[in-house]
Curated annotation (Swiss-Prot):
The lineage of its organism: Eukaryota, Metazoa, Chordata, Craniata, Vertebrata. Changing residue 168 to A: Slightly increases IL11RA binding. Abolishes interaction with IL6ST. Abolishes stimulation of cell proliferation. Residues 1-21 form the signal peptide. It comes from Mus musculus (Mouse). This is Interleukin-11. Changing residue 172 to A: No effect on IL11RA binding. Decreases stimulation of cell proliferation. Residues 182-190 are annotated as: Important for interaction with IL11RA and for the stimulation of cell proliferation. The gene is Il11.
Length: 199
């Protein structure tokens, strides 16, 4: 009996492809088929980034008080207002949000690189902010892929950002970047929550 079993095992080993059923490809992730779940994840990441931005903006005001509005011509303009919420469409919102956040990511990277000694004390917070921005952008890209939406390019060519003219210039730039990002994320949370009800 043992000889027969061994003989069978030897014969089977000669044709492994016919005996072993192929399994799923290695490393194939589970893909969610529910866009509402993907949108929920994007909303949570956006809210978390909004809270981080609000906290960092408050730190900036404490460390470097600066009255008045601050702006940078290179920052994107806020595309939507409260009056336009009712007419929002998911493709336009996701496309514009991704383009705007890519611009803010570039500005945060620039701030970390060229902000000078004054902003070095905020380097850990700026690094964490950049990491969360990158994570949210990956989530938005995934959501757009699941919904078969085009990956839009920026409306205008990217212009390299020059170094701030002075230490005060870098501080004003930081106020402008954080303030603009805060407004963009606040609008994004409202818009995404509204659009979720239409899926």
């Amino acid at each position: 009996m043992n000889c027969v079993c061994r003989l069978v095992l030897v014969v089977l080993s000669l044709w492994p492809d016919r005996v072993v059923a192929p399994g799923p490809p290695a490393g194939s992730p589970r893909v969610s088929s529910d866009p509402r779940a993907d949108l929920d994840s994007a909303v949570l990441l956006t809210r978390s980034l909004l809270a981080d931005t609000r906290q960092l903006a408050a730190q900036m005001r404490d460390k470097f008080p600066a009255d008045g509005d601050h702006s940078l011509d290179s920052l994107p303009t806020l595309a939507m207002s409260a009056g336009t919420l009712g007419s929002l469409q998911l493709p336009g919102v996701l496309t514009r949000l991704r383009v705007d956040l890519m611009s803010y990511l570039r500005h945060v990277q620039w701030l970390r690189r060229a902000g000078g000694p004054s902003l070095k004390t905020l380097e850990p917070e700026l690094g964490a902010l950049q990491a969360r921005l990158e994570r949210l952008l990956r989530r938005l890209q995934l959501l757009m892929s699941r919904l078969a939406l085009p990956q839009a390019a920026p409306d205008q060519p990217v212009i390299p950002l020059g170094p701030p003219a002075s230490a005060w210039g870098s501080i004003r730039a930081a106020h402008a970047i954080l303030g603009g990002l805060h407004l963009t994320l606040d609008w994004a949370v409202r818009g995404l929550l509204l659009l979720k009800t239409r899926l």
